């Protein structure tokens, strides 16, 4: 078949990628129109024609269109076809086109010689590692496996950019042999003389340095090797490699995570780490991913200066479950400050009483049961690197149970009002047990306020030198929590309905299932017999 304008003859061949039910049933391909064209050209072993140069202009293969920009050439070709009466109609259609992230211009494919790292032949090894890593959360394992399974080319690692790690190669001007320096020293071949005198192949002495740079992931992909002193301190490396954890965002699973696994496995024959901790995106109020190019990113520095790191950290930990996108809102970040104020005021109340040891009463056993549940669930969250669980579990416990119910229940007893010394000491002991454990659970998330309270109440040694609490004995009383909350709410509402202050007495019968807590309930609510 003869192609108009250029008058070239092209073969028509059968291929399964052409769909008879779609359009004319024929598919036109060119050397480098898109990725599908490239694959078909390689498969069919066709002779390429390079029509666009590195400046984005048409080459001599474009005939009379040589020198025009790509869009200019397209417009001129349409015009010429119309003049030849070969155009049936012109219409605008929408289709998927890869565009540059920064300039938003369509991407044109140009063949160039580059360096590659082999990855196709390593796919089975990479899949084995992807299946063996412990993902947090598990759902993101699929992203890595899907990416590895979809790999169809090796990894191009050289780039024609200015700011990146230089490719450390000098080429012999005589035979074009690539000559490398000894490892260990950073070199800039495009501006420095080679650290050798002659070509290793032909012995000539004239060289030209490579002007290209590496893909940024070439550096990042060996970060586990750098921190474990690979090839610099063998004893240290053997003790620390593989590392424990790779924390990162989900959008760079196919780059940073994949290339790290690829290169570290190639160099060491081992996975680079045991755990992959994958977080979501920070998104704006409309749910769009934050980025500099979109102009919707929020500078965290003013927020940190205004609210402090603890508030920011607690918001980040408690906003969404691990792996999910999180909506960035200064209102929500500031709102976390209410809880930190609650924590501070609770600690201030507890600080009124000495640290003692005493056997707990029933009310104390109940809150210690609830505390044990918080400790257990929080430690499970930490074990899974999911800070959302301890952040919210501790927050809910202090806000909804410990402060409004337990502290109010034992306040009279803690002050020694109409209670014996042993009962009062039991309240003191339990208050401090709860406070200590809650501070320890929160310390990794809010390191500053917890350390401040800890040093004020318990020890001049930092809280960050302590160990996590252990789950205590189960008194089998946490099942009564809903009943306590329900009864307290009932009394508060009754007083409100009757126009009474919370300090006023009221006559309400205590349910049988709460009789174990009668003394504290009567003291709390001023219940009349």
Question: Across the structure, where does each feature detected by a protein language model lie?
Answer:
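Residue patterns forming the tRNA-binding/recognition surfaces of aminoacyl-tRNA synthetases
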Residues: 8, 17, 22-175, 204, ...
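Short, conserved secondary-structure transition motifs
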Residues: 98-103, 250, 280-284
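Short Ser/Thr-interspersed hydrophobic loop/turn segments at strand-loop and sheet-helix junctions
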Residues: 258-266
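Short active-site loop/helix that positions an aromatic residue
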Residues: 37-46, 225, 229-230, 261
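Active-site cores of enzymes that catalyze phosphoryl transfer or operate on phosphate-rich substrates
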Residues: 1, 101-105, 221
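A short glycine/serine-rich beta->alpha loop
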Residues: 240-251
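Feature 926 captures the class I aminoacyl-tRNA synthetase adenylation module centered on the KMSKS loop
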Residues: 143, 150-218, 222, 266-309, ...
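Active-site-adjacent "gating/activation" loops or surface patches in catalytic cores
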Residues: 5-13, 211-241, 400, 404-407
């Amino acid at each position: 078949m003869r192609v108009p304008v250029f008058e070239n003859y092209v073969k028509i061949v059968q291929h399964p990628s052409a769909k008879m039910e779609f359009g004319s049933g024929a598919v036109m391909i060119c050397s480098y129109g898109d990725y599908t064209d490239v694959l078909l050209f390689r498969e069919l072993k066709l002779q390429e024609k390079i029509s666009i140069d590195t400046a984005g202009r048409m080459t001599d293969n474009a005939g009379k269109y040589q020198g025009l920009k790509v869009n200019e050439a397209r417009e001129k070709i349409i015009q010429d076809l119309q003049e030849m009466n070969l155009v049936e109609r012109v219409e605008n259609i929408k289709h998927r086109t890869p565009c540059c992230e920064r300039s938003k211009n369509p991407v044109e494919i140009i063949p160039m010689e580059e360096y590659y790292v082999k990855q196709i032949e390593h796919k089975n090894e990479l899949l084995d590692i992807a299946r063996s890593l412990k993902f947090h959360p598990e759902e993101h394992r699929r992203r890595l496996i899907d990416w590895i399974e979809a790999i169809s080319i090796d990894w191009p690692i050289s780039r024609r950019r200015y700011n990146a790690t230089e490719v450390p190669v000098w080429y012999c001007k005589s035979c074009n042999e690539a000559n490398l320096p000894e490892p260990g020293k950073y070199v800039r071949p495009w501006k420095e003389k080679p650290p050798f005198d002659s070509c290793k192949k032909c012995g000539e002495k004239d060289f030209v340095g490579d002007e290209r740079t590496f893909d940024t992931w070439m550096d990042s992909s060996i970060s586990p090797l750098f921190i474990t002193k690979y090839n610099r301190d063998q004893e240290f490396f053997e003790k620390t490699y593989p590392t424990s954890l790779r924390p990162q965002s989900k959008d760079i699973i196919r780059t940073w995570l994949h290339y790290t696994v690829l290169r570290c496995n190639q160099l060491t024959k081992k996975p680079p780490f045991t755990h992959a901790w994958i977080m979501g995106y920070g998104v704006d109020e409309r749910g769009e991913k934050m980025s500099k190019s979109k102009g919707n990113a929020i500078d965290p520095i003013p927020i940190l200066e205004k609210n402090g790191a603890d508030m920011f950290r607690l918001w980040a930990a408690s906003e969404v479950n691990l792996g999910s996108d999180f909506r960035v809102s200064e209102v929500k970040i500031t709102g976390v400050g209410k809880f930190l104020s609650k924590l501070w005021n609770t600690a201030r109340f507890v600080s009124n009483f000495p640290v003692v040891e005493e056997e707990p009463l029933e009310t104390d056993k109940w809150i210690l049961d609830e505390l044990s549940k918080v400790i257990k669930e929080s430690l499970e969250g930490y074990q899974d690197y999911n800070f959302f669980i301890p952040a919210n579990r501790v927050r809910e416990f202090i806000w909804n149970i410990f402060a409004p119910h337990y502290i109010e229940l034992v306040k009279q007893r803690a002050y020694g009002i109409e209670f014996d010394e042993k009962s009062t000491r039991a309240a003191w002991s339990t208050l401090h047990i709860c406070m200590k454990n809650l501070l320890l659970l929160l310390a990794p998330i809010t390191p500053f306020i917890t350390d401040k309270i800890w040093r004020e109440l318990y020890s001049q040694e930092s809280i960050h030198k302590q160990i996590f609490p252990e789950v205590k004995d189960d008194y089998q009383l946490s099942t009564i929590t809903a009943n306590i909350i329900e009864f307290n709410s009932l009394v508060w509402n009754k007083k409100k309905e009757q126009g009474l202050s919370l300090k006023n007495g009221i006559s309400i019968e205590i349910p049988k299932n709460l009789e174990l807590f009668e003394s504290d309930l009567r003291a709390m609510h001023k219940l009349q017999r």
